[in-house]
A protein has these predicted regions:
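Catalytic core of bacterial c-di-GMP phosphodiesterases, primarily the EAL and HD-GYP domains
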Residues: 83-152
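A short, well-structured catalytic beta-strand-centered motif of the EAL phosphodiesterase domain
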Residues: 36-71
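Short acidic-capped amphipathic helix/loop micro-motif used as an active-site/signal-coupling element
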Residues: 63-66, 88, 171, 248
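Surface-exposed amphipathic alpha-helices with a cationic face
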Residues: 128, 154-166, 211-218, 239
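Structural preference for beta-strand elements that scaffold enzyme active sites
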Residues: 37-39, 55, 103-105, 136-140, ...
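Signature for phosphate-centric chemistry
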Residues: 64, 106, 171, 193, ...
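EAL-family c-di-GMP phosphodiesterase catalytic domain
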Residues: 1-34, 48-52, 143-147, 176-268
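Catalytic-site-adjacent helices and loops of nucleotide signaling machinery
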Residues: 73-76, 169-179, 235
């Protein structure tokens, strides 16, 4: 990802400066850290085998439900750290207010983390402030530019898992999330990118690829979720491949500041 001409390789300089200023906990918790505001929509994560919603993913939105890009377009190298921290606080606050018992999935950008033990303080403080259990939180690794320092990402993931969080790799099978991440990073779960899911019921190639990926992850004890499920045929094909954890518009679109219920018929 490029922020107003600042490449990912230059971001650590800015991130280190922002972490050093100690703006994270107090500023983000009180909503003072950013010069723009935003909120969240939530989309359910479902388990067909249990016929239940087991979690929700938080997705950024404008205050009047404007799409994510209208918010992300305001993120720069100078405020990416504070934006990442504010996303965590916002998602936790809304989840706690709704008193959800399911998992909460929060996207995070590895480039916005310099020292994991410093950056996580905001998350821990928010969980304490709002009374939301940290063991219900999953961090989804989101990256739009190739990560040169995989060891740094591994350090972040190891630390997050050590203190009780789950870690997932988002958009797996597309972009820069490659098979070597399964070996190096040992995530708790992956989310298969919608590009491999869309039309899987009519594509033998996609079916074979996703089947092989699911079997590999099963052998590595890594959970698999398919994202971008839009039709019953896609849902059923994935279920036949033993991919029972799914997400997509077939079950529910993301809803503005709401944790959607999935109709029973969507499981049948």
């Amino acid at each position: 990802m490029n922020f107003n001409g600042i490449s990912a390789s230059e971001l650590p300089i800015y991130i280190k400066e922002q972490e050093t200023r100690e703006l994270s906990c107090e500023g983000c918790l009180n909503g003072e850290a950013l010069d723009f505001d935003f909120t969240m929509a939530f989309q359910p994560l479902i388990d067909l085998s249990q016929k239940c919603t087991f979690g929700f993913e938080g997705l950024v939105r404008g205050l009047n439900n404007e799409p994510a890009h209208t918010v992300i377009s305001q993120v720069t190298a100078q405020n990416v750290y504070k934006f990442d921290q504010s996303c965590r606080v916002k998602a936790i606050a809304l989840a706690a207010e709704a008193k959800i018992k399911e998992r909460l999935s929060i996207n995070f950008m590895p480039g916005a983390v310099y020292k994991p033990n410093i950056c996580i303080r905001t998350t821990l403080a928010a969980a304490d402030k709002y009374g939301f259990p940290r063991e219900q939180i999953t961090f989804e690794v989101v990256e739009e530019e190739k990560i040169a320092d995989t060891a740094h990402l591994q350090n972040i993931i190891d630390y997050y898992k050590e203190i009780g969080f789950k870690v997932a790799i988002d958009d797996f099978g597309s972009g820069f999330a490659n098979l070597d991440w399964l070996a190096k990073l040992a995530p708790d779960s992956i989310k298969i990118d919608m590009s491999l899911i869309r039309g899987i019921d009519t594509s033998n190639r996609k079916t074979l690829i996703v089947k092989a990926l699911a079997e590999l992850c099963s052998a590595l004890n890594i959970d698999v979720l398919a994202e971008g499920v839009e039709t019953k045929a896609e849902r059923d094909t994935l279920a036949e491949l033993n991919i029972v954890k799914q997400q997509g518009y077939f079950f529910s679109p993301p809803l503005f500041e709401t944790f959607p219920s999935v109709p029973e018929k969507k499981f049948n």
